[in-house]
UniProtKB/Swiss-Prot annotation:
The gene is ADRB1. One of its GO terms (cellular component) is plasma membrane. Beta-adrenergic receptors mediate the catecholamine-induced activation of adenylate cyclase through the action of G proteins. This receptor binds epinephrine and norepinephrine with approximately equal affinity. Mediates Ras activation through G(s)-alpha- and cAMP-mediated signaling. In dorsal pons neurons, involved in the regulation of sleep/wake behaviors. Disulfide bonds join 25-31. One of its GO terms (molecular function) is beta1-adrenergic receptor activity. Its main location: membrane. Homologous desensitization of the receptor is mediated by its phosphorylation by beta-adrenergic receptor kinase. This is Beta-1 adrenergic receptor.
Length: 73
């Protein structure tokens, strides 16, 4: 999942913002800023962080409940 979120959009230039500041930076080889568009930043954050967070919390909750059942037996 991380490879798809990171490499594919960057290679396909889906991350590029279209404002003037971003265009100047893209054309300047000395500019080191990574200017992204908002949709890419949100989608990347959700897929890379929030989806795994929810899955992990769900799995840990199930493990915790099962551990509580085992203690009661």
């Amino acid at each position: 999942i991380s490879a798809l979120v990171s490499f594919l959009p960057i290679l396909m230039h889906w991350w590029r913002a279209e404002n003037d500041e971003a265009r100047r930076c893209y054309n300047d080889p000395k500019c080191c800023d990574f200017v992204t568009n908002r949709a890419y930043a949100i989608a990347s954050s959700v897929v890379s962080f929030y989806v795994p967070l929810c899955i992990m919390a769900f799995v840990y909750l199930r493990v915790f409940r099962e551990a509580q059942k085992q203690v009661k037996k």
